[in-house]
Amino acid sequence: MANETVLYDYWRSSASYRVRIALNLCGEAYRSVPVDLLAKAHRAPEHLARNPQGLVPVLDIDGERLTQSLAIIEYLAETRDGTGLLPAHPIDRQRVRALSYAVAMDIHPVCNLGVVARVMAGAGDGEAARREWMQKFIGEGLAAFERMLDHPATGAFCHGDRPTMADLCLVPQVYNARRWDVDLAACPLLVAIDRRCAGIDAFQRAHPDRAKP
């Protein structure tokens, strides 16, 4: 169908995970088309035709093709009423964006598949190098995020008392932190927020364990 909403994603991709949560929170029905990053399906001509960057996610929605997870989430916030993904007031939106960018632009890029593969290739023990790399950069990034949460606007969630784009960025990063055994003992605020999000159906349905083909 021409107007069908289709998400091209990879089950373990943080960026894809963010968009799955956003679509669920918006009540947007969609069909998932897996793009296997480990099999390099994102570099196949078919996927490069969808996204010249060769990245996931790609979202077909409203007759358009969208890329870049935060741009997609902002589009949903602007076109779907009542999502709350971005607050109404400019200063509140700025804070939500700052928190989101702290994950998506500072932690995520140095921990993505291509960067880590290069790290492993240059190490004697690739697996040990990968684990050390992930623990260092995810750990340092989330420690900074925890400090950002020490703010009057933090509520039950990253900003206020309902999930915003910031929570959609945080939760996949905490998932990755646990995957790589990052010590989160010094991050009680973000751990508590992640726990609250885990109780919400939209987050549960987006979890990698549910999205895995």
Swiss-Prot record:
Classification via Gene3D superfamilies: 1.20.1050.10, Glutaredoxin
Disulfide-bond pairs as recorded: none
Protein's name in the database: Maleylacetoacetate isomerase
Enzyme Commission numbers on file: 5.2.1.2
Pathway entry: Amino-acid degradation; L-phenylalanine degradation; acetoacetate and fumarate from L-phenylalanine: step 5/6
Isomerase as UniProt keyword: yes
Location of the GST N-terminal domain: 3-84
Coiled-coil residues: none
GO CC annotation, single: cytoplasm
Domain (GST C-terminal): residue spans on this chain: 89-213
Keywords linked to the UniProt accession: Isomerase, Phenylalanine catabolism, Tyrosine catabolism
Catalytic activity of the protein: 4-maleylacetoacetate = 4-fumarylacetoacetate
GO terms, biological process: glutathione metabolic process; L-phenylalanine catabolic process; tyrosine catabolic process
GO terms, molecular function: glutathione transferase activity; maleylacetoacetate isomerase activity
Isomerase in keyword set: yes
